[in-house]
Amino acid sequence: ATNPAAGGYLIPEIYLDQIIELLYSKTVIFELGAQKVPMANGNLNIPKMTGGARATWGGEARKIAKTQPTYGNIRLSAKRLEAIVPQTRELLMSTNYSADQLFANDLTRRMELGLDFGAMFGKGGEFQPLGVFTDKEVEHVDAKTLSNEDLADSNGKITADFPVFVRSKVLAKNVDDNKLGWAFNSVLEGYLMNLKTTTGAYIYRDEMNTGKLLGFPYRVSNQITTDTTGLTELAFGNWADLLVGEQMGLETYTTLDGSWVDEEGNQHNAFEENLAATRALMYVDIAARHKESFLHVKNIKAF
């Protein structure tokens, strides 16, 4: 509080040797039960039965009807999740904050979030996995167009009956309920927790305080967004049917002489600019064993 010229320069400033960490979204897929499978050569084929035989009733001396199972294939091929983080050598040498460890922890967390995002929202194709929320073979429900006021109105504002409807649609497909779970964001979590009976009693709050909804666990990720009009989305399903093929898990490498191009298209060289650059890589792919194990709901009005 002393004026610098009146002696303030003589009062040393104290810095705590800690840094306030960044607030991250939560990851959800592995917490809900997604499974890692090895992908040694960068690809993996998983045969699957798409249709079964059929048993019929018959009579004496009658021909037995022939039925034939059908088969398909799930193919995983490695896709690269990547990041490069440069730091100046002066920063690494001059700080007491263990800046290298801070950067490493941040990079690891970012890669975990990138994998989670790909599992939910990946667009598919050569360079991205296909996510549960975007896979056209996963059943999709639009909360705005249900034409059933007992479940949701035309704006997508859902009722307390809606989660029961979602659960029932998935279970009707004979889905294994061993790892069924919900994924939605904190805004929708709050909306569901605030649903009340006509007498003012909270319907789901006590159960949701234990981390479950209708008997199944839920996880919150704010990578699932809510737009400015209050619309958001959720997924419900058997997350054990979500396979993460892994050719190589997280690898980090730090160099003093690498080069890279930044987001603005400028070329950088670590040696010339006295930088240290840390690169992180994963080689993975993601697929659902059974597409019918999941249900995605969009256009839910959360506020």
Model-derived features: where do they sit?
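Sequence/fold signature of self-assembling virion shell proteins
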Residues: 72-77, 101-108, 157, 187, ...
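Short, conserved beta-strand edge motifs with alternating hydrophobic and charged residues
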Residues: 181-185
